Every structure is written in C-alpha cells, then in structure tokens.
Amino acid sequence: MTLESLEPRRAPAVADTDALVALAHRARSGNECTCATGRGTIVNFDLREPNDARAFVVRGARRREVNALTWRNEHALFHASDAVVVELDARKMSAAGDAAVIRRFEGARDVVNGVDVDQDDAMLAACDDAGEVIAYDLSNGEILRKLRGHDGCVTAVAFRRKRGASECATASTDCRAMKWDVKAKSVPVRTWDARNMLSAEDYDCGKVTARAEYESASIDAGASAKAFNPPMLHSLAFYRGETSEENAPGLRRVAVSACGDGSVIVFDIDHPGVSGGSRASKGKKKSSLASAGPFADGRVECVRLGADGVRGHTNAATCADFVPWNRTGDVIVSGGADRRLLVWNWVDEASHAARGLPVASIERDRKINDLAFAADSRAICVADTSPTLKLFALR
C-alpha cells in the first residue's frame, strides 16, 4: 500500500492565520467532508468538484473554536463550541450562521470535545473537559442521562454502529476507555486502562504471566524517552463501513484509539475482561475479526500498534480510524503530533503488530489534528494546523 497526496481544498472564508481543528467523522455524504476551524468557521467540501466549497461562519462575532461536529442527516449538522452543542439546518446556512440554528443543547459543565449521533438518529452524545458525557433525546432535546466515571477530560465519544443499540464508548486523558449502556445506567459497563491492557505481543513474547508483572515491566520500560508520555486516549472510533459477510458481526465489536505515548490500540468492547471485567452479553454470536483473531482465547485485551515508538509514531498519536471502504475492516489510518500519517493492517500477524512496520506512511510539515474519510470518493481527509484540508488516496 502507498499514500498518495491529492489536490487539497481551501475555502476563502478561512483566514491564513486560522487552523483546522476537527472533522466530521459522520459525513453528510460519501463524497463530502466537513471541517471546523479554531475561529468558528465550518466548511463543507464536495470532493467531486475541485473548487466547490460552501462555507459559513458560526458565531463569527465571538470567534469561538468549533471543537467537534457531526451530521445527523443531509440537513442537520451538530457542532460544539465551548460547553454548548448547536444543531444547524444546512438548508438555511447564512454568512453569520444565525439563521441556520435549530436548537441548542446545554448542560455540559465544561468545553465539549466530542459529539456523536447513534445509528437510529435518536440520541446525541457529547463529552466534555469535566469528565462527563451527556446523552440527549433528539425527539425532544431533553437530557436523557449524564454518564460519569472518567477522572480526566473525555476526549471522544462514539456510538456503536448497530441499529437498536444504546451502547457507546468513550476515551479520556485518564488513559481509560469506557463502555456505556446509555438507556440502562449512568456508570460504565466496562473499563479498559491503556497503561495495563494486555496485548497480543505481551503473550507472544512470554513477558507477562500476570497483570502485576505486566505493570512492573511497564515501569521498567520507562528508561525510554517515549515512556514520559502516558497513553492518554485522544480519540476513539468504530468501523463505519457497510456490514457484509466478511466483517459482521465481529467487526462491529472492535474499537480503535490513538494514544499519547504514540501507540494505537485496537480492542474488543465485548471482551469479558482478564480480571473480573463485565462479561459479554450471553448469546452474542462470535465471528470475524473480533473472535477469530487475536481476541479468540479471551486473554488478549488489545492489539497495540507501534508500541516501540520507533517504527510507529515518535510522538503522541492524535487520531485513528478504520478505513470504511475496506470491507474486511483490517486497515487503520492514524495521525500524530510527529506530523506523520500511518496506515496499519491490525489483523495481519496481529500477535506481532507492535513490532511490525506500518504498511504505508507519509510525513507532512505540520501536526495532524484529526482525520476522517469520504468513503465514496475513497479519500482520506486530514486536518492539520494549517487552514487547508489535505486529501490522500490509499493505493
């Protein structure tokens, strides 16, 4: 595989001194990409038209950063500024953005970092710097439930891509990922700690016989410069491609997170846990990657990519996601503060993944803040600290 640079996109509404900070992971369509800037500009690009960009300014007078955004459908766009999530009507976008506002969702105690809508378009989830996640009922705009469990900023929230499911997962700077059942309870169903998750490589190398020994080994490894960066979780994503016989239902159980220590972890959110974690629901069919791959024996909690900090990211990994048009779901793209975009095959020889090379890479001139995909255009969309949207093809 190779990464090929495509023609970048730039909107006149974005100033030279501005920077892209977030992309909509749930796109308006498979040929579009929506990005947000640090000065409150939201730009929607149709990648089929080289010069076609539609931009509008949100709360332009206050120039507040748009931290996260996602589409509910082709008309409704949610974006987060400060502690408020705003729903916009794309059919009424104006220069100031005010005419497009449908409603506002409040209740967050601090800056909202991530938003997502469930597969049924019935719930909105927003996570914030205070360590909370708020789930809203989109039928009436009311708060459905507040989820508490993290000790640090919650950096990302994502619903499982399964109709009828009320489960979501979150990532945080406390180095933990949590699984929640929004309609059932306000406490997490399952928790993973990136500092002591047992990976496929740990068992393959015979380094670990118990969790206590693993934790001791992690401390001993602190001699490397990379150990000074704890594995804070900066992103979390589920596979968003179409379900097929090649990937269902197992792939719907797998999540990926980018870590502050430069690694990328892939884990099964239905994993029962090595030491007394919540058991997976009885009767769930095990198949495909999640059960037939590295998680099959029930011991391994994750596949850790680029854990040595040399052949992967050499600084914090800031974002990671599954390539949606790859029907087997085994390809992941990650970006980092080291200005590199990496492509991984997490399934191929998963037990050796932490020691293996990325299958493709490209180095940029700026830190990468976020990435998303235009699935129908087969484009990887990258937001860095510039005002220009970078595009790449995976050949």
Residue ranges and their predicted role:
Residues 9-15, 54-61, 101-107, 143-149, ...:
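Short C-terminal beta-strands that terminate individual repeats in beta-propeller domains
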Residues 17-25, 63-71, 104-117, 152-161, ...:
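Canonical WD40 repeat/beta-propeller blade segments in eukaryotic WD-repeat proteins
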Residues 29-30, 73-75, 121, 163-165, ...:
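Conserved loop/turn motif of beta-propeller repeat scaffolds
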Residues 33, 76-77, 124, 168, ...:
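Hydrophobic beta-strand positions that form the internal "hydrophobic ladder"
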Residues 36-39, 79-83, 126-130, 170-174, ...:
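Conserved strand-to-loop turn within each blade of WD40 beta-propeller repeats
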Residues 42-46, 85-91, 133-137, 157, ...:
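WD40-repeat beta-propellers
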Residues 291-321, 350-375:
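Conserved blade-ending motifs and adjacent loop-strand segments that build the rim/top face
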Residues 370-395:
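Blade-level signature of beta-propeller repeat domains, shared across WD40, Kelch, NHL, RCC1
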